């Protein structure tokens, strides 16, 4: 069955909504996935604000199926530091005090659910962040208790958000991705277990974040058929031979030819 193909606007945050919609239509897309904060301010409560967005989409014959709140979501469970200032809006970063950043990020994620309702969509795609990503490699030794506390922290922060989403009939789709509480099949299962399989929580499936890790990205679909709420289509290449920079990335930038893996456009990778 053919499905609509939409353009996620996050990478075009420097362009006004009207411009990116015009381009998306000319590129042949069926719709857009509106990215926060550049193309949607979920703090707005005036229905006219959301009507104007719909008018813009209708002007170009574009559909809307979900909105994205990745950057703010990252600040919910992360241990906040100076890196976050570069990706967070000023109204989330504030004075940079971690407790304040966490609280404002949670509030904004709940506002995103209300915005989704105003726009007539039922899915918010985003990140969660993770208090335990820094312990990915088990040296110095990482205990089960430390890891379990990380998942408990995720549950404490996200269950109240998910409860609000459920009341509104909106779902949260975590993009399974490095630096999030779920970054492969095993951690995705642990995340679901931590929140007792909350009905408002599922996944945004992007196999490009799984393949280079050695994760069976087809099996992921089989494991969570009812929890995949949205899909991102992106490709990734990983080398058939050893490289100078391994799977961890070697503190190099994306695109470096010495890397074992790099993201690529559809059809130019190995997915």
List where the protein language model places each region.
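Boundary/entry segment of secreted carbohydrate-active catalytic domains
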Residues: 1-15
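Active-site-proximal loop/turn and secondary-structure-junction residues that shape catalytic pockets
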Residues: 11-13, 36-38, 70-73, 128-132, ...
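Glycine-rich, proline-tolerant flexible connector loops at the mouths of alpha/beta enzymes
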Residues: 34-58, 73, 128-135
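Acidic/histidine-rich catalytic cores of soluble enzymes
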Residues: 19, 31-32, 67, 148-265
